[in-house]
Amino acid sequence: MDVQIFPHRLLGADTTEKLLNRLEDISGVKRMVIHGQRLPPEDHPDRRIISVKGHEFELQVKTGRVLLEIEDEDTIADIKRVCEDLLPFGYDVTPGKYIRTQKTVTDEIKYGEDLDKVPEELIGLTDQNARLSERATIIKRKKEH
């Protein structure tokens, strides 16, 4: 099951970083994808390194929506609590199917013979128009003992 968080305004780097960290704390969240306008390649205050649970990566978009793959509907209440705390300007949380889980013909055209080398957790997370260096960053959830 997937959920879309649609903030009523674009998120800056600080808010994106806080939101992703709080969402990562929710045990029912399996994967997260951020979507938005690409930031200009030159100096921009939001094009910076952000940290999500100790994993650092360069934020390359002005966050307009966050897609989450979740385990069950009970997780939605936890997601809404996080949004209520961090997005006072308003937001919509909508369940649906947003993240692809199977390889497509487009993937085959994009990756060619290397398609079998694409990790399963990357399926549905990459921008087919992006260069390899700009593709998704996977943040692995630490196993709880």
Swiss-Prot record:
- Gene Ontology terms: biological process: methanogenesis
Keywords, comma-separated and alphabetical: Methanogenesis
Membrane spanning segments where? none
Q: Give the superkingdom in one word.
A: Archaea
Subunit structure and binding partners: MCR is composed of three subunits: alpha, beta, and gamma. The function of proteins C and D is not known.
Q: What is this protein called?
A: Methyl-coenzyme M reductase I operon protein D
| Source organism (scientific name) | Methanothermobacter thermautotrophicus (strain ATCC 29096 / DSM 1053 / JCM 10044 / NBRC 100330 / Delta H) (Methanobacterium thermoautotrophicum)
